[in-house]
Amino acid sequence: VGGVVIAIILLPVLAVIGVMSNGVQGASDALVHVNEQTHEIEVRTFSGDLITTLTASTTWPIKGVITQEFGVPNPPYQIAHSGIDIDGGFGKPVTVFMQGKVLHAGNFLAGCGDNCVEVDHGYGIDSIYAHMSAHNVQVGQSVKPGDVIGLEGAEGWASGAHLHFEIQVRGVPVNPRSFMVGNPDKG
């Protein structure tokens, strides 16, 4: 019985390790399936079970230029980048991409500085907005696409002003582009 309990506890961990051996893009592809024609997103478990179906957002958190893509090694650390970096200009407003509730606001994540925000969108989907110069939301606050949650900055482990935009499914980083339509080009 003890061996069965250990196997049940370790099964999700082993699934994550197996998928992660294919890299962060492999994990992202396993959890999020996108229909490029309809912009419909299927969010799944590592075992392939459907969690929910969504429509991709057109509300990028900031207009700007992508300076680093998801999964690309991040110098000087040489680990895969867990989000997308967007440079829209220091002090520009940062908005939430999808309806949700603020889970964390402040310094809760190593390297993000004092003005990070994490939003719980339900279905195990969270988004993180890091390196901001200020945040203006409180834990438990409801937010919707377009609501300003902070300002672009260079807080924490940042080489310059930008927004680090990360989406996680059940705690695993996935490619934010899977949830977005188009590009965050400056208007």
Residue ranges and their predicted role:
Residues 2-71, 187:
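Polar/charged, compositionally biased leader and regulatory segments
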Residues 64, 82-84, 115-117, 147, ...:
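Extracytoplasmic/periplasmic beta-strand context in beta-sandwich domains
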Residues 65-96, 169:
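Short glycine/threonine/proline-enriched tight-turn/helix- or strand-capping micro-motif at secondary-structure
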Residues 79-81, 96-136, 161-163:
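Zn2+-dependent peptidoglycan hydrolase active-site motif and core
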Residues 86, 115-119, 144-156:
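Short hydrophobic beta/alpha edge segments that flank linear recognition/processing sites
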Residues 87, 134-147, 166-187:
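Acidic, glycine-rich catalytic/binding loops that coordinate metals and/or anionic ligands
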Residues 91-92, 107-110, 154-157, 168:
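Short polar/acidic secondary-structure junctions
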Residues 93-104, 137-152:
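Short, well-structured beta-strand-loop connectors
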